[in-house]
């Protein structure tokens, strides 16, 4: 073969090879795997007597217990313990073994309204929460997401009308306070709509008659939470307040001001300030001596601030915060000694353990994330209207179209949040 032809041939061969490589790099497969989903099984290795099983139960060695358990066992306490373990390990399997109810269970139709550009970080977490809740029930369900992209009155009205056209009987709307106000500008609320992210008291521009009877709210009442902490402020204790430099910080600052708390020093804290917080103080600085510190900063900033205050000789007598810091990340960011005088108000109660465990499998936190918690309450409220005898997982009530939470004060002792027995020392 002449040199020129060979050169052209190899050039074409090289081009073909590169094209194939590019196709392989950009190709995506949308075929579902034929493999069945994973199912946990525990293999029995050695015999275990009744006393042996009871010892394993008392020691909470769940995997050893399940591997040794015999289905012919007649001990009721062992039976109950075994069933509880299986419900956590394989909740879907247990649900499939539950006899079908004779009563009619309607298909659940649910619309999710969200402006992705505004609340995108909540979207996946809330969806996982709702899926976890519905998967612990036996009903068929259909969830459809309607993205308004933003919170302008026009976009929200257009998206709401799309939901109405599809005739969904219930809507969960992930909106900010401004989003709710914009929705009410042009839109008539004709379908029961639940907003898990806003508290009704935030809508100060809307009087009671102007709000639709079909609009419900599930947001945390930060004013009530901060009000519970006032009794922890000593008469001669100067109050220092650190607020986040974002919207939530400004909102909490306004609430603190409305409660007539005399603040000696107030400061908005950015992430840059939080990381170099201790540079403003010397070890023997008496700035925090006998003071009460109110932390209206999110968990990461609070962790940075507390860990650096812990290096000072004089520390605040008490550190007070709200739901914003009821987060296990705070326990990891600080030492127990840095938060021994920290008091946090929390509205979330212990709900159905099976639901909590199932949600955690979908990376949804129902113990500490109040938006997830509130969203699940909204779904349950809807299901309860379909069936008055519906077995509820949450104990919160609905008053004047607002979820009423049971706020309690916790301390961050050791590596967990522990409920205080009394509200005062």
Question: How does the language model describe each region?
Answer:
Residues 2-12, 26-425:
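Extracytosolic ligand-binding ectodomains
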Residues 13-21:
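Bacterial N-terminal signal peptides
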């Amino acid at each position: 073969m002449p040199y020129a032809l060979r050169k052209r041939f190899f050039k074409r061969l090289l081009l073909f090879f590169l094209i194939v490589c590019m196709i392989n790099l950009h190709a995506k497969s949308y075929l579902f795997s034929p493999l069945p989903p994973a199912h946990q099984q525990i293999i029995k290795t050695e015999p275990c007597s009744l006393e042996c099983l009871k010892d394993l139960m008392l020691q909470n060695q769940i995997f050893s217990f399940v591997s040794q358990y015999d289905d012919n066992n007649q001990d009721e306490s062992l039976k109950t313990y075994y069933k509880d373990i299986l419900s956590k390990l394989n909740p879907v399997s247990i649900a499939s073994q539950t006899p079908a109810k004779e009563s009619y269970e309607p298909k659940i139709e649910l619309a999710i309204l969200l402006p992705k550009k505004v609340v995108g970080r909540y979207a996946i977490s809330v969806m996982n929460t709702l899926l976890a809740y519905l998967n612990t029930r036996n009903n068929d369900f259909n969830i459809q997401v309607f993205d308004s992209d933003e919170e302008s009155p026009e976009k929200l009205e257009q998206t709401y009308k799309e939901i109405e056209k599809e005739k969904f009987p219930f809507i969960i709307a992930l909106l900010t306070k401004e989003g709710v106000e914009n929705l009410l500008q042009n839109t008539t609320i004709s379908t029961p709509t639940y907003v898990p992210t806003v508290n009704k008291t935030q809508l100060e521009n809307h009087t009671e008659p102007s709000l639709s009877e079909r609009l419900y709210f599930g947001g945390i009442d930060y004013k009530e939470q901060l009000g519970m902490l006032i009794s922890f402020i000593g008469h001669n204790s100067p109050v220092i307040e650190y607020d986040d430099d974002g919207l939530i910080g400004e909102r909490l600052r306004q609430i603190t001001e409305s409660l007539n708390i005399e603040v000696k020093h107030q400061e908005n804290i950015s992430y840059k300030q939080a990381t170099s917080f201790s540079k403003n103080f010397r070890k023997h600085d008496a700035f925090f001596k006998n003071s009460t510190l109110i932390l209206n900063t999110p968990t990461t900033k609070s962790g940075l601030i507390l860990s650096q205050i812990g290096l000072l000789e004089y520390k605040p007598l008490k550190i007070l915060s709200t739901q914003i810091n009821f987060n296990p990340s705070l326990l990891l960011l600080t030492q127990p000694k840095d938060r021994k005088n920290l008091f946090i108000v929390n509205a979330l109660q212990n709900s159905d353990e099976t639901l909590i465990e199932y949600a955690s499998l979908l990376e949804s936190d129902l113990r500490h994330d109040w938006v997830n918690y509130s969203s699940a309450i909204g779904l349950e409220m809807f299901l309860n209207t379909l069936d008055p005898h519906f077995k509820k997982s949450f104990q919160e009530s609905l008053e004047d179209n607002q979820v009423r939470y049971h706020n309690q004060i916790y301390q961050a002792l050791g590596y967990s949040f522990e409920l205080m027995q009394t509200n005062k020392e």
